[in-house]
């Protein structure tokens, strides 16, 4: 969230798109800035201006909104979002609504707790926002404003021909069993034990207090941000990155998916194995932008410890053995019910 604007993979992807389709560069940058640089984008939207990222845009240190845009997805962005269009198609793809008519200093920040007059005055004085209790901050539809994303696609003539569902995490959750028991916030903002003071001044302990960890599965990107913190203008400390990585690895290993060999049979010289993969998340696995993937890696050894079958191995660059897509970007590896050859690999 905090590094949404600094994500080098995202920046490189957007840049590649603008170089490939220069006539649509402004449209692409404005669209992508909506959710990755929402503070700067919202500020420009108030003046009906287009948000640019490269050149003289937000990435330029000389831009008036450079620092604001680099803050990525901040507290005051999400907590200003109104619920007027929640769950409706117009709320998706960065369609969040923020009150731009009320002057700064009088705008509302929504939260889950009731706020007394004195604490409200203190917060308004310190932050410029008036705290207001509203249960909509606990709804998954809040997250859906950016995590249900449809992006335009181009036809052979270079014209926008429609939209493609780039990610539909909210809709996946909405159609899952989790929709009746858990919200996005239940997993991404785990509740702290006990009650917690919500202010350094006149703050009485309250609960449940949701810890804003937003733990995902992208350990690779967190490692890259940590290693290149200076070049990427990262403000988090080394210890904070280590803590985040620890949470990611814990989630991936214990609360993401389980792999179980249900049955293994040897008939003559033939070994057959039934494998069950169970998702433990409230949406597709893997979820999010399409570059993410998960795959089955099955290795069979003989009595001497030598490998006699290996499906799903990978090299130092992350290329999966047998994956047609790694060999040719225009191809896709087929899905399999049965794998009989090491060059076949089940990829999700």
Where are the regions that the model predicts?
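Long, well-ordered hydrophobic secondary-structure segments characteristic of membrane-embedded
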Residues: 2-57
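Primarily the internal scaffold of c-type cytochrome electron-transfer domains
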Residues: 2-9, 13, 50-347
């Amino acid at each position: 969230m905090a590094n949404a604007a600094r994500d080098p993979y995202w920046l490189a992807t957007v840049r590649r798109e603008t170089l490939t389709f220069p006539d649509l560069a402004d449209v692409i940058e404005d669209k992508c800035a909506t959710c990755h640089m929402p503070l700067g984008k919202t500020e420009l939207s108030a003046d009906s201006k287009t948000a640019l990222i490269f050149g003289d845009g937000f990435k330029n240190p000389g831009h008036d909104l450079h620092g604001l845009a680099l803050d990525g997805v901040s507290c005051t962005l999400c907590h200003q979002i109104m619920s007027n269009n929640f769950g409706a198609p117009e709320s998706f793809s960065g369609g969040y609504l923020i009150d731009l008519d009320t002057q700064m200093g009088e705008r509302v920040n929504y939260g889950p707790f009731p706020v007394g007059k004195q604490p409200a005055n203190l917060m308004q004085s310190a932050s410029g926002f008036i705290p207001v209790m509203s249960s909509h901050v606990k709804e998954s539809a809040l997250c859906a404003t950016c995590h249900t994303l449809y992006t335009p696609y181009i036809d052979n003539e270079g014209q926008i021909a429609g939209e493609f569902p780039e990610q539909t995490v909210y809709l996946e959750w909405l159609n899952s069993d989790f929709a009746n028991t858990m919200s996005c916030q239940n997993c991404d903002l785990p509740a702290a034990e006990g009650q917690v003071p919500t202010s350094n001044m006149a703050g009485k302990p309250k609960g449940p207090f949701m810890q804003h960890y937003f733990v995902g599965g992208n350990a690779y990107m967190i490692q890259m941000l940590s290693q290149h913190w200076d070049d990427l203008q990262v403000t988090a400390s080394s210890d904070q990155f280590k803590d985040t990585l620890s949470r990611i690895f814990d989630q991936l290993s214990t609360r993401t998916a389980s792999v179980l060999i249900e049955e293994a049979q040897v008939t003559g010289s033939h070994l057959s194995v039934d494998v069950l993969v169970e998702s433990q998340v409230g949406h597709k696995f893997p979820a999010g932008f399409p570059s993410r993937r998960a795959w089955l890696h099955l290795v069979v050894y003989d009595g001497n410890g030598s490998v006699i079958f290996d499906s799903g191995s990978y090299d130092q660059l992350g290329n999966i053995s047998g994956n047609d897509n790694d060999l040719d970007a225009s191809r896709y590896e087929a899905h399999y019910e049965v794998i009989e050859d090491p060059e076949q690999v089940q990829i999700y």
